[in-house]
Swiss-Prot record:
A 1,2-diacyl-sn-glycero-3-phospho-(1D-myo-inositol-4,5-bisphosphate) binds at K118, R122. InterPro entries: TRIC_channel. Keywords: Endoplasmic reticulum, Ion channel, Ion transport, Membrane, Osteogenesis imperfecta, Phosphoprotein, Potassium, Potassium channel, Potassium transport, Transmembrane, Transmembrane helix, Transport. It is found in: Endoplasmic reticulum membrane. The gene is TMEM38B. It comes from Homo sapiens (Human). Residues 256-291 are annotated as: Disordered. This is Trimeric intracellular cation channel type B. One of its GO terms (biological process) is bone mineralization. The modification Phosphoserine is found at S262.
């Protein structure tokens, strides 16, 4: 007989994301679009462009994973129900009378609920990406990690293409160069679920899904309640960097010291030469006067 914990985790892993969790994901994604400078005015001026941007935020992970697996990038359009649902969320968010949706979303409990439900969908996307990649490349763990990462956090990456088309792209805002917290935590989850799928972790999938979801939901709520934009992995990253690349630091410090000493020696030798020349001239003048 299974324990209550296993029964709870198994029931949680069988929870359907449609429609409530998908609605929360679309709402948070569309609200992120609306909060961009000039997004509301663009929706009235060019609604097609605004709708396209919102769909990239909602389905960016699926689009990126399709591109990586050489599948049709417009495959997400085949799911008419989700497209209509996301489009409805976009419409009422931008064109609701008196901006009621944005006013309701401005309350912190509503934001906490929607953001927490969105993080639940992140777990399902990572697991779906890892499983889908395994159907193409059996136990190809690098591909599985990449597709799981793309499926879970591809929305923040694929939107760089949208900014490039609009002329708002900046190199310092590239997700590949400066990874955000969602991208890092999704990459961590993709690695963990890949190892579990390849049987390198002795834990069941439903238990891992439950534990990982609790972790990302708790950290997201903590970030929002404490009003911190990121929860850094800096201690772990610094430790890993020291373990892998720390041996290079002594050599680099020695090189810097040698470079610092060499200019000073050169300056001293150059400065001593005029003094020696001046002393020789004074001696010559003194001898001439004596003569």
């Amino acid at each position: 007989m299974d324990s209550p914990w296993d029964e709870l985790a198994l029931a949680f892993s069988r929870t359907s994301m449609f429609p409530f969790f998908d609605i929360a994901h679309y709402l948070v994604s569309v609200m992120a679009v609306k909060r961009q400078p000039g997004a509301a005015a663009l929706a009235w001026k060019n609604p097609i462009s605004s709708w396209f941007t919102a769909m990239l935020h909602c389905f960016g992970g699926g689009i990126l994973s399709c591109l990586l697996l050489a599948e049709p990038p417009l495959k997400f359009l085949a799911n008419h129900t989700n497209i209509l649902l996301a489009s409805s969320i976009w419409y009422i968010t931008f064109f609701c009378p008196h901006d009621l949706v944005s006013q309701g979303y401005s309350y912190l409990p509503v934001q906490l609920l929607a953001s927490g439900m969105k993080e639940v969908t992140r777990t399902w996307k990572i697991v779906g990406g890892v499983t889908h990649a395994n159907s193409y490349y059996k136990n190809g763990w690098i591909v599985m990690i990449a597709i799981g990462w793309a499926r879970g956090a591809g929305g923040t990456i694929i939107t760089n293409f949208e900014r490039l088309v609009k002329g708002d792209w900046k190199p310092e805002g590239d997700e590949w160069l400066k990874m955000s917290y969602p991208a890092k935590v999704t990459l961590l989850g993709s690695v963990i679920f890949t190892f579990q799928h390849t049987q390198h972790l002795a834990i069941s999938k439903h238990n891992l899904m439950f534990l990982y979801t609790i972790f990302i939901v708790a950290t997201k709520i903590t970030m929002m309640t404490t009003q911190t934009s990121t929860m850094t992995f800096a201690p772990f990253e610094d430790t890993l960097s020291w373990m892998l690349f720390g041996w290079q630091q002594p050599f680099s410090s020695c090189e810097k010291k040698s470079e610092a000493k060499s200019p000073s020696n050169g300056v001293g030798s150059l400065a001593s030469k005029p003094v020696d020349v001046a002393s020789d001239n004074v001696k010559k003048k003194h001898t001439k006067k004596n003569e």
